[in-house]
């Protein structure tokens, strides 16, 4: 585990409100619950004839993605548009960054265009924290995923999915399965589940895909699928991240599927009403059988729907927190 997983007070303003969203580590249960409650209230916007509310009218949100993304980028764009914000999405492959401009130079140029918020995805762990510490303080920073470190909005949309299907975290058993070592989603989910009071958090993976020190998250570690899935309420499958792997961690994808793929037979060991989740993109026949991904227990497409509402909640709350912080600073400067 990384020293980046320490409490980061710069996420909160002087009143304890969200002003950046960088990691779930150190955020109180009350704040995570507020995000879930706010997201719940935004779900009905997607069913309207006009799918908009005016909360961020006049604000400019820049999506700056240094890594490829489909679901995260698109749902952030939709979330901002449904809040009536103006949205700029930077294609890094055609931007000055691909010509040698530094990360901070790119963002400071966007900042000079009076952007109010950056949603940043970057391959380096800690990039979002670095940006929040170095750009103009009145610009809110939302972490869209940084290296292996964190993917906090994915963590929260997974929590909303679980809460809407299971009602409460208090008596749940949740299994997170697959490439734990390289997964920022796994880290965010473990933190969120622990904070929200889930008593039984399990990780299931080959020993080569388990990070050193994972026990600090308060999880039970399994290297056998049948044992780890026994009587669980929720199964969260993870993508096998070949692009982040060095050689020798796995014999083959086929061998991984044979031992750790979620099949109908293996899912039968979980509770009969267990739900199956996956952050996407899915590798069918590697992490999960198509019959399971498309089956009645799968809530994978629900996750995408809930992701828009969660990102609406985070964008609106962080913008509100930034405004409150500026007012606080102005009042105390007088």
Swiss-Prot record:
Pathway: Pyrimidine metabolism; UMP biosynthesis via de novo pathway; (S)-dihydroorotate from bicarbonate: step 2/3. SUPFAM superfamilies: Aspartate/ornithine carbamoyltransferase. Its EC number is 2.1.3.2. Keywords: Pyrimidine biosynthesis, Transferase. It catalyses: carbamoyl phosphate + L-aspartate = N-carbamoyl-L-aspartate + phosphate + H(+). GO terms for molecular function: amino acid binding; aspartate carbamoyltransferase activity. The keyword Cell division does not apply. Carbamoyl phosphate binds at residues 71-72, 121, 151, 154, 280-281. It holds the Pfam family OTCace. Disulfide bonds: none annotated. InterPro entries: Asp/Orn_carbamoyltranf_P-bd, Asp/Orn_carbamoylTrfase, Asp/Orn_carbamoylTrfase_sf, Asp_carbamoyltransf, Asp_carbamoyltransf_Asp/Orn-bd. One of its GO terms (biological process) is 'de novo' pyrimidine nucleobase biosynthetic process. L-aspartate binds at residues 99, 184, 239. GO terms for cellular component: cytosol. Belongs to the aspartate/ornithine carbamoyltransferase superfamily. ATCase family. HAMAP family: Asp_carb_tr. NCBIfam families: asp_carb_tr, PRK00856.1. Catalyzes the condensation of carbamoyl phosphate and aspartate to form carbamoyl aspartate and inorganic phosphate, the committed step in the de novo pyrimidine nucleotide biosynthesis pathway. Heterododecamer (2C3:3R2) of six catalytic PyrB chains organized as two trimers (C3), and six regulatory PyrI chains organized as three dimers (R2). This is Aspartate carbamoyltransferase catalytic subunit. The lineage of its organism: Bacteria, Pseudomonadati, Pseudomonadota, Gammaproteobacteria, Pseudomonadales. The gene is pyrB.
